[in-house]
């Protein structure tokens, strides 16, 4: 109560709010990793089949503009992956958001985080701001995961093998990080939402670059193999 009075004197619209309500929505280690791991699992199951019709049709030509290339088809399939990602992300996160509002009401979303956490520097940053930043960060990470699965799919040309490799590369690391308290988007958002966004963007860009390099190496390998066969 004394803290709320202090905040009120500073011109902050202080409110009582159950800390558990906020933690259950954006700062719950269990819910964060469970939801994101479930989303990644859905991606691992669905994304490999986007390119599967091309595994036996010179799929590697899809990723470069050559005389035999199919750039339009490649980017069309990328759009399909993005739509699949958006549907999966919405289906997983929106229902929880709706349940939260139905249970606690929308007013609690406007509560400044300084009413809950004393170490928050920006007094205007509210629960809804934290929720939005949290969702943006997870969507960027999910996009990066989609790039990883696509790269594995291009490299292996096998849906089932892609699922196995993607599980090792994505799902298992998530399970390994589960017990580390500070490795959570919600933790970063509370301490510095700018750092959370920047770090997530950098990680996503890095993964995208690695994906493109994998496709480049695979294309070069295939081109060399075809030249050798042509000479033979």
PLM ranges: what are they?
Residues 43-47, 59, 148, 210-211, ...:
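Hydrophobic/aromatic residues in alpha-helical transmembrane segments
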Residues 1, 38, 48, 56, ...:
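Intrinsic structural disorder
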Residues 61, 74, 162-163:
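Hydrophobic/aromatic positions within or immediately flanking transmembrane alpha-helices
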Residues 64-70:
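Short helix-to-coil transition segments within interhelical loops
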Residues 3-54, 74-155, 159, 193-200:
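Secretory targeting signals
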Residues 62-63, 83:
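Long, hydrophobic, well-ordered secondary-structure blocks that form the structural core
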Residues 105-133, 160-232:
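Terminal transmembrane helical anchor/hairpin motif
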Residues 55, 61-62:
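Membrane-helix interface linkers and caps
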